[in-house]
Amino acid sequence: MGVTKELKSPGNGVDFPKKGDFVTIHYTGRLTDGSKFDSSVDRNEPFQTQIGTGRVIKGWDEGVPQMSLGEKAVLTITPDYGYGARGFPPVIPGNSTLIFEVELLGINNKRA
């Protein structure tokens, strides 16, 4: 249970986000049946958040710090690290495993 990371394209291998850092990412979220529920890429607007502080789902708080600046990866997140039994109606059913394609574009003021 938790989050697993599949590397798609390596980052710089040097800069990794730490708890409390602000990150800029592009992502596409899908359910295991392949249906897309959200995408910053489709909106052409990267997502910014503080990581490791509970502002996003636990799977992101745990998975994004495993990525280095510029990296592209797929994060597979079990329900207990996602939206749990309640889900996120109407787009994410309860107990859903989430699959996110993520690109780490920035950490604080440093860009890939």
UniProtKB/Swiss-Prot annotation:
Localization, UniProt: Cytoplasm
Biological role: PPIases accelerate the folding of proteins. It catalyzes the cis-trans isomerization of proline imidic peptide bonds in oligopeptides.
PROSITE patterns membership: FKBP_PPIASE
EC code: 5.2.1.8
Cross-referenced InterPro entries: FKBP-type_PPIase (IPR050689), PPIase_dom_sf (IPR046357), PPIase_FKBP_dom (IPR001179)
Ranges where the PPIase FKBP-type domain occurs: 20-108
Protein name: FK506-binding protein 1A
Organism encoding this protein: Aspergillus fumigatus (strain ATCC MYA-4609 / CBS 101355 / FGSC A1100 / Af293) (Neosartorya fumigata)
Catalytic activity reported: [protein]-peptidylproline (omega=180) = [protein]-peptidylproline (omega=0)
Molecular function (Gene Ontology), one example: peptidyl-prolyl cis-trans isomerase activity
Location (main, coarse): cytoplasm
GO cellular component: cytoplasm; cytosol; nucleus
Keywords for the protein's UniProt record, in alphabetical order: Cytoplasm, Isomerase, Rotamase
Family under the similarity heading: Belongs to the FKBP-type PPIase family. FKBP1 subfamily.
Activity regulation comment: Inhibited by both FK506 and rapamycin.
Coiled-coil segments on the chain, per record: none
